[in-house]
């Protein structure tokens, strides 16, 4: 199955000059969605994983489905004010400025094995922020998995010390 056939390309979104890779069309197709999750699971099937950590919002969609497939827990990473309990945070760079991600401070215990998951890796900033939070809690990052990689933005370089798995490259 050619997964690129299920990704909609939207020119000039969210701003002029950007070609947005829209995964909603893949998610809508039950066969393509199942195939993508199955293939992502195959890429890391040899790893023992306690948790998948995924950032809102599309990371929740891919990460929770993958956690179900791998029979492990899912830990949501959110923006400020969205988690009800005490949190840790990590700032990361955006194209113009910075943002901050948050995770519950008791989400991971020392030595627990974690896979970082998101729908897409571009600059690597979101993935690196999630990795740093896992390591603050003394978890072990076993790698990362992404549905899509935008290769020209070289985000893989930010997290090259960890295994990176990708299904679709642009």
Curated annotation (Swiss-Prot):
Location(s), subcellular: Cytoplasm
EC number: 2.4.2.7
Chief location category: cytoplasm
Entry keyword Transferase: yes
GO cellular component assignments: cytoplasm
Function of the molecule: Catalyzes a salvage reaction resulting in the formation of AMP, that is energically less costly than de novo synthesis.
UniProt protein name: Adenine phosphoribosyltransferase
Protein source organism: Brachyspira hyodysenteriae (strain ATCC 49526 / WA1)
Gene this protein is translated from: apt
């Amino acid at each position: 199955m050619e997964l690129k056939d299920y990704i909609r390309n939207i020119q000039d979104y969210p701003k002029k000059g950007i070609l947005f890779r829209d995964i909603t069309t893949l998610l809508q197709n039950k066969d393509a969605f199942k195939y993508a999750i199955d293939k992502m699971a195959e890429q890391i099937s040899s790893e023992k994983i306690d948790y998948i950590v995924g950032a809102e919002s599309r990371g929740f969609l891919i990460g929770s489905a993958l956690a179900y497939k791998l029979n492990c827990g899912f830990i949501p990473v959110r923006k400020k004010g969205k988690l009800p309990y005490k949190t840790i945070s990590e700032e990361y760079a955006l194209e113009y400025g910075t943002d901050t991600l948050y995770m519950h401070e008791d989400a991971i215990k020392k030595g627990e094995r974690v896979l970082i998951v998101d729908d897409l890796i571009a600059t690597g900033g979101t993935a690196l922020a999630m990795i740093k939070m896992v390591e603050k809690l003394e978890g072990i990052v076993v790698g990362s998995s992404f549905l899509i990689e935008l290769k020209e933005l070289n985000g893989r370089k930010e997290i090259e010390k960890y295994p990176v798995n990708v299904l679709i490259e642009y």
